[in-house]
Amino acid sequence: MDTPVYLYTDGACKGNPGAGGWGVLMRYGSHEKELFGGEAQTTNNRMELTAVIEGLKSLKRRCTVIICTDSQYVKNGMENWIHGWKRNGWKTAAKQPVKNDDLWKELDTLVGQHQVSWTWVKGHAGHAENERADDLANRGAAQFS
């Protein structure tokens, strides 16, 4: 069995919308890598999605990936909602356009290239890796605020 790659992801936004950042702590066995970035004008949900996208984009080959996020929006979107959105032509059950569909489509493509499972962690609750991802996201946002 492949050693899984763990992606601990988080997004941050100073104002919503406003300056935002994303952060990823990657762990593969004893190896770690930190990624972060940001945008001048964005939302917290876009940064949560971007964190996962950037983590997956950094992988160099097909992997078993465990994504640990404190975002119910991202986890529920990928595990539950996306199937209906795709069936409905990227419309919600209320027939409204899916928000952030550009990022959802990119994430859907990237997830298809790996064996991915999703884990939700409570944010700001002392989970060491999530706190590190949060710090990285805030560093990303600080570049634009």
Swiss-Prot record:
It catalyses: Endonucleolytic cleavage to 5'-phosphomonoester. Residues 1-142 form the RNase H type-1 domain. Its cofactor is Mg(2+). Its EC number is 3.1.26.4. One of its GO terms (molecular function) is nucleic acid binding. InterPro entries: RNase_H (IPR050092), RNaseH-like_sf (IPR012337), RNaseH_domain (IPR002156), RNaseH_sf (IPR036397), RNaseHI (IPR022892). It comes from the Bacteria. This is Ribonuclease H. It comes from Neisseria meningitidis serogroup C / serotype 2a (strain ATCC 700532 / DSM 15464 / FAM18). The lineage of its organism: Bacteria, Pseudomonadati, Pseudomonadota, Betaproteobacteria, Neisseriales. The gene is rnhA.
